[in-house]
Regions:
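Compact, glycine/acidic-enriched structural inserts
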Residues: 80-82, 86-143
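N-terminal accessory interaction module
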Residues: 44, 54-55, 60, 66-98, ...
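N-terminal ordered "arm"
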Residues: 7-66, 79
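Sequence termini and other peripheral, non-core segments
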Residues: 2-23, 33-37, 208-209, 214, ...
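Acidic, carboxylate-rich catalytic segments that either coordinate divalent cations
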Residues: 382-434
């Protein structure tokens, strides 16, 4: 219950009647303060008028006023600047060190807030707050979506910088692994990252002028050159890998790491690895070229490459030949790589270099790419939140994974709009949405 008292105070969801202290003094909340995530009072920097006098300081919140003593705040100097103690149940007075009584406000959580929060936490279908989404002002949606987009970039930046730290702070290796992970397109993302991490890029760089040797290392490290090979190309590739494996002390990942079920042939790991080998061989996708890619067209140029001759007629080593065809990345695949790898890399590098222009470049890139189409974006579209670009779809993914799936409605702007709704307004919206 205390978290709902916090919420009620933070958002000033107060009863219609006047607020008064236990001594009958009129309370006017000018600013509830900022939630404190460190030791000390729950809210800091509050501004409150008590009996006409403006006070600035901190606010502490409990279920019972006696919790003040149970938590030993009476012996903690961090609480000496508390100007108001808020509790649902006032069962005792509390005092400053000098013996003066601390003003207390009895604040009950409105019943509709309790009911609405309970409904949100019990409802399974997403988005849980769909009944109010269609009524929200455009500015409310825009502001929250912008916040979610920045949160998404921050999360990706944290992941990329952690990856870089594990790679001796090498940005080129970080780029390769980040791009490689995205070539798994969800299903094989972890496998591609594990595979890319197994490849010593310094060693591969010594053979970058040979697509055959690059493919030998790439496929060998993927565990896909084990067993009997049935044609000249794959047999020679296996022999080359065994030589390079001994030369560089390479340890491949297990072939069982890869998933093939429900994949179309053009999405098989073999094809994706062949595409990566070709991109790496052509040396177009480097950190330098990435930093100069200011549009999706420029990124498309960096990622547009065909596979070597063998892979134009094969999907695996052991499968029958197919009709010759190009195996270039599709426009949709390039968009996804730009969304999930290129833009986050630009943003992370911009943060690392304190270069706001690079961060803006990443943000602009998302805003100029078509939105992703998946179950998450379709669910939100049916509730009235339409994604106009990739920044929007990434915001909705952030919303779903970091707020909806964790039921963290109290930190969510959409959740706030639902929770504060009175019963009459909520029923009205439910009827409209039926």
């Amino acid at each position: 219950m205390e978290h709902l008292i916090h919420y009620t105070w933070k958002h000033k969801i107060f009863p219609l009647q006047e607020l008064r202290t236990t001594e009958g003094l009129l309370v006017e909340v000018i600013n509830p303060g900022l939630a404190n995530t460190h030791d000390g009072p729950d809210f800091i920097g509050a501004s409150i008028k008590i009996d006409g006098t403006l006070w600035s300081g901190n606010v502490e919140i409990h279920i019972k006023s006696s919790d003040w003593f149970r938590h030993h705040h009476d012996r903690d100097s961090n609480y000496d600047n508390v100007i108001l103690h808020v509790a649902s149940i006032i069962d005792c007075p509390i005092y400053y060190p000098n013996g003066q009584e601390i003003p207390q406000l009895q604040l009950s959580v409105p019943q509709h807030v309790i009911n609405n929060y309970d409904m949100l936490t019990r409802r399974d279908s997403l988005p849980r707050c769909k009944d109010v989404l269609s009524t929200l002002p455009t500015i409310t949606i825009h502001n929250w979506m912008t916040t979610l987009t920045l949160e998404r970039f921050a999360l990706r930046t944290q992941q990329i910088l952690a990856r870089r730290d594990s790679l001796n702070k090498n940005w080129e290796d970080t780029l390769f692994i980040t791009i490689a992970r995205n070539f798994g397109f969800g299903i094989n993302g972890n496998a591609f990252e594990q595979w890319a991490q197994s490849i010593p890029m310094g060693a591969v760089g010594k053979h970058r002028d040979s697509i055959f040797q690059i493919e030998a290392i790439f496929f060998g490290q993927a565990g896909l050159l084990e067993g009997t090979m049935h044609d000249t190309y794959s047999s020679n590739l296996q022999k080359e890998y065994l030589y390079l494996q001994q030369k560089f002390s390479l340890t491949p990942i297990s072939r069982k790491t890869w998933k093939f079920l429900h994949l179309r042939p053009q999405n098989f790991p073999h094809i994706r690895i062949a595409q990566l080998a070709s991109i790496y061989y052509q040396q177009k996708l480097t950190l330098s070229s990435l930093l100069n890619a200011h549009s999706i067209e420029a990124i498309t140029h960096l990622l547009t490459t065909d596979v070597s001759e063998y892979w134009r007629t094969h999907y695996t080593f052991d499968g029958p030949p197919s009709a010759s065809a190009t195996r270039k990345l599709s426009p949709t695949s390039i968009d996804l790589i730009a969304i999930n790898s290129v833009a986050p890399m630009l943003f992370a590098y911009g943060k690392y270099k304190s270069d706001q222009d690079l961060c803006d470049q990443a943000f602009d890139l998302w805003q100029n790419i078509k939105p992703e189409k998946n179950n998450i974006t379709r669910n939100w579209a049916s509730a009235g939140i339409i994604c106009e670009n990739a920044a929007d779809s990434q915001a909705i993914i952030q919303q779903t994974r970091q707020y909806c799936q964790t039921r963290d409605c109290l930190r969510c702007a959409f959740g706030y709009e639902y929770i504060k709704c009175t019963p009459d307004l909520l029923r009205e919206q439910e009827v409209r949405n039926e």
